[in-house]
From Swiss-Prot:
The lineage of its organism: Eukaryota, Metazoa, Ecdysozoa, Nematoda, Chromadorea. SUPFAM superfamilies: Metalloproteases ('zincins'), catalytic domain, Spermadhesin, CUB domain. Zn(2+) binds at residues 207, 211, 217. Metalloprotease. As part of the innate immune response to molting and injury to the adult epidermis, positively regulates the activity of the transcription factor sta-2 to promote the expression of epidermal antimicrobial peptides such as nlp-29. Through regulating the expression of epidermal antimicrobial peptides such as nlp-29, modulates sleep duration and locomotion quiescence during the sleep-like state called lethargus which occurs during molting between larval and adult stages. This may occur through the sleep-active RIS neuron. GO terms for cellular component: extracellular region. This is Zinc metalloproteinase nas-38. Residues 306-345 form the EGF-like domain. Keywords: Cleavage on pair of basic residues, Disulfide bond, EGF-like domain, Glycoprotein, Hydrolase, Metal-binding, Metalloprotease, Protease, Secreted, Signal, Zinc, Zymogen.
């Protein structure tokens, strides 16, 4: 006969299995509309008090901006959602989070945020991948886009995702009629609503995943008022809460700068009463068309997650240039801001057309243009330039001539971007549409980065002239900015040919296009590319009467080269770096400098294709239990591999069992009830629903019965039984 101790452990294990199964199967409920409305009213009241103090000073900054009637409306989550259903436009709150926020108002602790802090917002356990699933309401095409958005986060951070993984705390993508997510981990199965159509855009999905990982909206940072102004005169009073920041005691900015190019930033016309007047105005006027992009996470969005989850703590610090930092997926190279590449961000990112490169600015005016200017540039063009002045100089730039790109409120598909800040992590001023920018740009230091993108459309593009306030450097000089590690003196040998008249012919070398996630959903093996040395490659920089050629050797993947005909525009080959070589002062440069590392971030998203599984059957039979949320229905599929999941269960019959019912024994199942609900659920009226593990009173009792060794022994076994459907 089994001992009492043995029986006790069997009962405890059974209860724990029930807890795991049902806390993962039923999505965490959102706060009630009544409680959500109460929090919004508190925020509205505070916004009104704050606005009374500042409105007279800030309202004038909107007088000179009116929406171009020919501008297309930029699509984002706010265009899909009913604002009454969400906190800050697309954020779900649990009842516990609502209570904590209300308590903060009561206690007078109002701060601001970027990344969620405990106890209100929790981070995920990174000792393993984050488990996720899809509800039946998510179609196949949308699932592919969700995987693509996850790969963006996975390739640039240390976080990993696993489809159908075993964790109790997990994500479930479903169609809830809008685009929304909780912020951070809330415990159990938490939903991310991706409505189709409407939210099924990779950029919007990456925004909602960003929330789930713990990121708030960028415009709600503590330094908000130093970067943007809110036009409360153009926002209904009931929507003011969407522009307020929430406590610093709930969040951490990690001293990262404000980023107008964040995928988490509102667009300029969100919640506008008058659709032709913005609700958000960037104080740097040239950034107005930058805010609100939904192409994908920015460099600083990735860095925020890497810092929050300690992704580079196990790596040694590298002497990364231009505000790069050690790559979380490859400790031997740097993660580089947009437009830069190389092991230490010492190179310009390769372009995929006849454009880009590194060009020295002098007092003499030079030009760059989009490919084929003034004819149309090819669709999906990517160009990157570094314009460098002498070390103490500045770069000046102005646009002229025809200017033509796809026209939207936010420029995130086809545009030219000017990165003039000394901090190269910051997204620059973006311009699109057909109105020629009238600004003169001046770099903060001696470098300016120009980025041009032509996704989904074609147009004439741009022409820009640039120059420096100083002349050509005479001998040994480098435009490289100071690094985090001391560098020895750098020298360079330049061949100076005899003065001659320049022929207007430039030879280009095709560069490797930027890798994107859409063709790498389930790549598991490292990608390697054969390399060919390009010996003594040269680039010619035109001036009025003199040609100067700088020779260098660059390793790049083998690609054909081609020549262009005559052109009026000076440019440089995108594969040539005019900066001195760092090979003598730093470790050998990665032979794949300029593209993603050959040792790619491991892709551990499970693929139905790998398993060779067929379609799921319909849900079979009646629910195995009549009440309490304990029962389940079953569906099956055929798979080629035994290790793949062939059966799936989902809970059913969530009506509470009659009072006094303490357990259910039926259909070869045994379930313990807690107030009429299966363990892992809690009673709300006559229904059973999910409850966060940390708040579950029955879990606490179970936990107190287990000693430390019991927990260690049972943990893995229970998880395996769960996956086999043994409970």
């Amino acid at each position: 006969m089994p001992s009492p101790s043995y029986n006790r452990h069997i009962i405890i294990a059974s209860c724990f299995c029930c807890l795991l199964i049902f806390s993962s199967a039923a999505r965490v409920p959102k706060a009630s509309k009544k409680h959500l409305a109460r929090v919004k009213q508190l925020l509205n009241d505070e916004a009104e008090r704050h606005n009374t103090l500042i409105q007279s000073d800030s309202v004038t900054v909107f007088d000179d901006i009116q929406r171009n009637p020919n501008t297309g409306v930029h699509h984002d989550e706010l265009a899909v959602n009913n604002a009454d259903e969400y906190f800050q436009g697309d954020v779900d709150l649990s009842e516990q989070q609502v209570k904590i926020i209300e308590d903060q108002f009561t206690q007078g602790k109002r701060e601001k945020r970027k990344i969620g802090r405990n106890p209100l917002y929790k981070k995920w356990d990174t000792r393993g991948p984050i488990s996720f699933d899809y509800a039946e309401s998510i179609p196949f095409q949308t699932r592919q886009k969700i995987r693509s958005a996850m790969l963006l986060w996975q390739q640039h951070t240390c976080l990993r995702f696993e489809e159908g993984g075993p964790n109790v705390d997990r994500l479930e993508f479903f169609d809830g009629g809008g685009c929304s997510s909780f912020v951070g981990r809330v415990g159990g199965t938490q939903g991310i609503s991706i409505s189709t159509p409407g939210c099924d855009v990779v950029g919007i999905i990456s925004h909602e995943i960003g929330h789930a990982l713990g990121i708030f909206h960028e415009q709600a940072r503590p330094d908000q008022e130093r970067h943007i102004a809110i036009n409360y005169n153009n926002i209904p009073l009931s929507r003011w809460n969407n522009f307020q920041a929430v406590g610093e005691n709930h969040a951490e900015t990690y001293n990262l700068p404000y980023d107008t190019g964040s995928v988490m930033h509102y667009g300029p016309y969100g919640f506008a009463s008058d659709p032709y007047t913005p609700t958000i105005r960037t104080l740097e006027r040239v950034q107005q068309s930058t805010i609100g992009q939904r192409a994908g996470p920015s460099f600083l969005d990735y860095q925020a997650i890497n810092m929050a989850y300690g992704c580079t703590e196990s790596c040694a610090d590298l002497p990364c240039l231009r505000n790069g930092y050690t790559h979380p997926n490859n400790c031997s190279m740097c993660a580089c801001p947009e437009g830069l590449s190389g092991r230490y961000c010492e190179q310009v990112y390769p372009s995929n057309a006849q454009c880009g490169g590194v060009i020295f600015a002098t007092k003499e005016v030079k030009y760059i243009t989009s490919p084929n200017y003034p004819d149309k540039f090819p669709i999906d063009t990517e160009c990157n330039w570094i314009i460098a002045a002498p070390i103490e100089g500045r770069v000046f730039m102005e646009f002229e001539g025809d200017f033509d790109f796809l026209c939207e409120d936010t420029c995130d598909k086809a545009y030219v971007e000017v990165k003039y800040h000394s901090d190269k992590r910051l997204t620059g001023a973006r311009y699109c549409c057909s109105l020629l920018p009238k600004n003169r740009f001046i770099s903060f230091k001696n470098e300016m980065i120009i980025i041009m993108r032509g996704y989904r459309s074609s147009g004439a593009g741009f022409k820009a002239k640039f120059w420096s306030n100083l002349g050509e450097p005479e001998g040994v000089s480098t435009p490289l900015p100071p690094t985090t590690a001391p560098l020895p003196e750098i020298s360079e040998t330049t061949q100076k040919p005899e003065p001659t008249t320049v022929q207007s012919t430039t030879t280009y070398t095709t560069a490797i296009p930027r890798r994107t996630a859409k063709k790498q959903f389930f790549t598991r093996k490292p990608i390697t590319i054969p390399l060919t040395p390009l010996t003594s490659s040269s680039t010619t920089t035109e001036s009025t009467t003199v040609s100067s050629t700088t020779q260098s050797t660059t390793w790049l993947p083998t690609e054909p080269s081609f020549a262009t005909g005559e052109t009026e525009i000076t440019t440089a080959s995108p594969t040539i770096t005019l900066f001195p070589s760092l090979s003598t002062i730093l470790p050998p440069i990665n032979s794949l400098a300029g593209v993603l590392p050959s040792t790619q971030a491991p892709d551990i998203i499970n693929s139905v294709l790998e398993c060779g599984c067929g379609a799921w059957s319909e849900w079979q039979g009646e629910c195995s239990q009549q009440c309490g949320g304990c029962g389940h229905r079953l569906r099956k599929r055929e798979c080629k591999k035994e290790a793949c999941r062939k059966e799936e269960k989902r809970p059913c019959n969530f009506s509470a069992c009659p009072d006094g019912t303490n357990f259910l024994i039926n259909n070869a199942e045994f379930h313990i009830l807690w107030r009429g609900c299966c363990v892992g659920l809690f009673r709300s009226g006559d229904q059973c629903s999910a409850l966060e593990t940390e708040s579950n009173p029955f879990f606490k009792i179970i936990n107190s019965l287990l000693n430390i060794q019991d927990a260690k022994n049972n943990d893995t076994l229970i998880a395996k039984r769960m996956m086999r459907g043994e409970h």
